Design a protein with these regions (language model features):
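Glycoside hydrolase catalytic-domain context in secreted enzymes
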Residues: 14-690, 698-714, 728
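N-terminal export leaders
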Residues: 1-3
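Short beta-strand edge segments in extracellular beta-sheet folds
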Residues: 720-728
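Extracellular and select intracellular beta-sandwich modules with Ser/Thr-enriched
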Residues: 715-719
């Protein structure tokens, strides 16, 4: 179909609604309402629900009439009361690419690893709720959030959108965020289904992995997020999985997602992820995204019409596609709570973002109690990282350009085009430190002159070096090094002043050749629009750090399953028959890989320091059928209030391929001297294996060693429990 015809297709007929619209009866279930509405739709109206338009337009294709200016747009059908679908990116805030919507701004939330580092379910929910509310207030009823891909490699350019390496932690935290988004009557996606764990050649490469390993790692994260969050839509991924494109993957979309997991929502494609019409529809894809711009054809228009007419795609499947979209619109409030454009509460959003950054920043190292900053400090040298202007953020479709504090604080950093521009959010740690410490002289140097930086550091009581690393969608990092000779800057400053603290604003783990030469390191990730204030509060002790790593921090690339991956770096992806062999580690992602290979990381999964101390003990474990319950006590033995994150791991019976699994955790805030009893029920599937032949989860009979731990590498107490063989429902 020609482009002009395609753009003329939307049906926005201005007719009065019928006097009787039974599908608007809120006493009915979403399924019943969808069935009643589907029965009244014409074939053209049905097809209208199965493709979105690019909501921004291009230099050749104008922005669709009615679109607010965003990632996608599906016109409504007024005669039936069907609302338009206004789709906005993404998972760290409502985007406004290039300021296309004049005056619109949103809260730039901290990155996914920051939220995950909080290990705080309620905080993840609240962050999602903030994004959902701002989406709704800006007129968007679909938010392309819910990124739950596992972080298999620290060089993945999109790790800043994800929630770590463990399926239980990632699935739980992203599921809670999705639940928060949808509490504001905004549909959320869950993405990118599945194994979209690297960006290099993402449109072409094949993720190779066994079925059992896939279910016990990436798919388990999706399954847990699905159970908790009930996302309206699942976005299929660009890449191939075992040679089959994600949006044509019958096994993943039909057999696993819709049949085994009984998912009632709809599957939408990623932008540019569709390669066929009937094949994709039969494999489980329900809605094509902006095909007129990103795909070779609008497969879900003329090609799908022909396939339905010819019986290649049965009408039952065609109706099922439409019904799933309608059901999600009913289930998550798009019909009953239409959006009302209004001003957002930017100050409330900033405070929400700041709280996430405070709980999600991780104190990696703190020798000789270097932090919090001593009250005796009279002069501080702050060096590097744009700390005088703001904090780093990630690039690509999730980039939030405009916040309550304004636009980019440092325009012109390359790249300035996709997946840039590089955005420095205007939240200056330097200014926040000066506000918090009015009687301290705080000098700033940008770090470009290492000699001057060393001179300033030597003259100060304390030096604080801010180091940044930009990462973005569609490209991977070439290696784990900090860019722009920042390692040399840190070495120089630390040599000049042994009381040097390093604050990292990075996509994830980086090499730290200087780690033993600085007393303190704070990992702030991409801390969002409240990041400057959060960092200052953590450094000064106004806030006690409580973040714990959601990923293992390798010493360098030699400890990774794939030390070298050809083609990584900031360069365009090229077509090819490439594959990534995830079978190397299989389900042993992150700390499981390190445990299996007996490797010692720089910092283990779950690691995080505090300004107080905690004692854990009294572990008792009870098993009844497939339910394992652990009880223990936690006491704050230090001088100030703080939050502990006791973690529970299980070492499976001898001979098992996976040596260790996180089975649960609890985050609790305790006053000095306070002791509390805690009970944690393990997620049953963390105790089980996926039987690929029988297509079910089974618990093997044997002795399981449950560890109460501070991190994956620091068990405090172990208790054994015997489990009987069982099959999970």
């Amino acid at each position: 179909m020609g482009l002009g015809i395609a753009l003329a297709a939307p049906l926005a007929v201005a007719q009065s609604a019928p006097s009787s619209q039974p599908w608007m009866d809120t006493a009915l279930t979403p399924d019943q309402r969808a069935d009643r509405l589907l029965a009244q739709m014409s074939e053209d109206e049905k097809f209208q629900m199965l493709r979105s338009y690019f909501g921004l337009g291009t230099d050749k294709i104008p922005k669709p009439e009615g679109a607010l200016g965003s990632a996608g747009y599906v016109p409504g059908i007024p005669r039936l009361g069907i609302p338009a679908q206004q789709l906005a990116d993404a998972g760290v805030g409502v985007t406004n690419p290039g300021g296309i919507r004049k005056g619109d701004y949103a809260t730039a939330m901290p990155s996914g690893p920051s939220t995950a580092s909080s290990w705080n379910r309620q905080l993840a929910y609240t962050g999602g709720k903030t994004m959902g509310r701002e989406s709704w207030q800006q007129g968007f009823n679909v938010l392309l959030a819910g990124s739950v891909n596992l972080q298999r490699d620290p060089r993945n350019g999109r790790n800043f959108e994800y929630a770590g390496e463990d399926p239980l932690l990632a699935g739980t935290m992203v599921g809670e965020s999705i639940r928060g988004v949808q509490s504001e009557h905004v549909l959320s996606t869950m993405k990118h289904f599945a194994l979209n764990d690297m960006e290099t050649r993402r449109n072409f490469h094949s993720a190779q992995i066994g079925e059992q390993a896939m279910h016990e790692s990436d798919l388990l994260a999706f399954e847990i997020a699905l159970k908790i969050g009930d996302p309206a839509s699942v976005m299929c991924s660009y890449n191939k999985i075992n040679g089959v494109y994600g949006c044509e993957h019958d096994y993943l979309l039909n057999q696993v997602l819709k049949q085994e997991w009984k998912y009632p929502g709809y599957v939408m494609s990623d932008w540019g992820g569709v390669h066929s019409g009937s094949k994709a529809a039969l494999a489980g894809l329900d809605q094509q995204s902006a095909g007129e711009v990103f795909d070779a054809a609008v497969y879900f228009d003329a090609p799908l019409r022909m396939a339905v007419s010819a019986g290649v795609v049965p009408r039952t499947r065609f109706d099922d596609m439409v019904r799933r979209v309608l059901r999600s619109l009913f289930a998550h409030g798009a019909f009953d709570h239409p959006t009302q454009r209004q001003s957002i509460d930017g100050k409330a959003g900033l405070l929400a973002a700041q709280r996430v950054a405070e709980e999600g920043s991780v104190l990696l190292r703190n020798e000789q109690a270097a932090l919090p900053l001593s009250k005796d400090v009279r002069r501080i040298a702050v060096i590097g990282g744009y700390a005088d202007k703001g904090v780093m953020s990630g690039g690509g479709s999730s980039r939030v350009d405009y916040t309550i504090n304004g636009g980019n604080a440092v325009p012109g950093i390359t790249p300035t085009t996709w997946p840039g521009p590089v955005i420095i959010h205007p939240s200056s740690p330097l200014q926040a430190l000066r506000t918090a410490l009015p009687n301290v002289q705080i000098d700033y140097l940008d770090g470009t002159d290492r000699t001057a930086a060393a001179r300033a550091a030597k003259a100060a009581d304390v030096a604080i070096v801010f180091a940044t690393q930009w990462a973005a969608e569609s490209v991977d990092l070439p290696d784990m090094r900090l860019p722009d000779n920042q390692d040399a800057l840190i070495e120089t400053v630390a040599k000049a002043n042994p009381k040097t603290t390093v604050v990292l604003e990075t996509n994830g783990p980086v090499r730290m050749p200087w780690a033993e030469r600085v007393p303190a390191v704070l990992q702030a990730w991409y801390p969002g629009i409240g990041g400057g204030e959060a960092i200052a509060n953590l450094l000064t002790g106004a806030v006690n750090p409580s973040g714990h790593l959601p990923v293992t921090w390798p010493v360098d690339e030699s400890q990774l399953p794939r030390p070298s991956i050809p083609g990584l770096g900031f360069k365009p992806a090229k077509p090819g028959e490439d594959s990534i062999d995830y079978a190397i580690e299989g389900a042993n992602v992150g700390y499981k890989w390190f445990a299996a290979r007996k490797l010692t990381p720089r910092y283990p999964f779950g690691h995080g320091l505090s300004y107080t101390q905690f004692r854990m003990g009294g572990l008792r474990v009870d098993a009844r059928g497939s339910q394992l319950t652990a009880s223990f006590e936690v006491e704050n033995t230090g001088p100030r209030e703080g939050a502990a994150v006791p973690q529970l791991y299980v070492a499976l019976p001898d001979g098992h391929a996976t040596p260790l699994r996180l089975i649960g955790w609890q985050k609790l805030t305790l006053k000095p001297g306070e002791k509390r009893s805690v009970q944690v029920v393990a997620e049953p599937k963390t105790l089980a294996d996926f039987d690929a032949k029988a297509r079910r989860w089974t618990i093997a009979a044997g002795t399981y060693r449950v560890q109460l731990a501070r991190s994956a590498s620091e068990p405090v107490q172990t208790a054994e429990v015997t489990l009987q063989a069982a099959q999970l429902p």
